[in-house]
């Protein structure tokens, strides 16, 4: 359970981790909204801006904002490592008793942070999710796909996964340390955080339109996120492949019985079309099964390599440069079989 931490001088009560990639257009609005909220807390805080290898003026603007905002800490990654890896970099280096993860586009309102912090303190919660009140602003396609995605998450990680909760959440120091101890290389925090089982609550909010710039989560990346969610938390696709193979075997067995019965009764069994259809069907099933197996093998391959999820080019907190993330511990049983 979360421990109460006061706001005495020199104590960082809250860290706000913000992954960003090419967010020069959204940064001014973010700073203008976030700083007054945090200054009004009356407690020590830091803002950990993780520049995920941006190619625009994001780094330049962050340096300029930092001149007048000493609580702003900038971590620059050497290359674009992806949103979840950038979030990992921020969580690894945040020092606050509580840590809030926030996107840079202001769609998740920073004004809800005090409410999340108050809820965690009052009820002794380790996790507070920001949950969308509704999705009326989304297109019909987005609502349909999002609904399916969250139903999938709840099947994989259980009912503890709140519907319509993204990466806007508050974590206690205990929850952050538990996440840092996990060996997972390819992380999906929407599943990892509920899986930990810490006491949690929710703060509902209306999601706003993007303040500026373009989304960094187009359809392709959303599909990849869904695939990582499935293969990272469940062996269900492999079981599905087994059932597909069994179903195809039953169909082929039925066709075989039908063919031999026809020959036994002296009937000519026309079958070039049906035979070709069966061959194509079986081939398609095999390719799907091989593809599913390949996804899992690729995850094992990545885990065995144990490469850092990100490389830090610089960190304004200590002037660090060229620092990889600490390799995640890989259990021996994952890399080789016991004799």
Annotate each PLM feature.
Residues 1-139:
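Structured catalytic core of nucleotide-sugar glycosyltransferases
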Residues 2-10, 188-339:
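Hydrophobic helical membrane-anchoring modules
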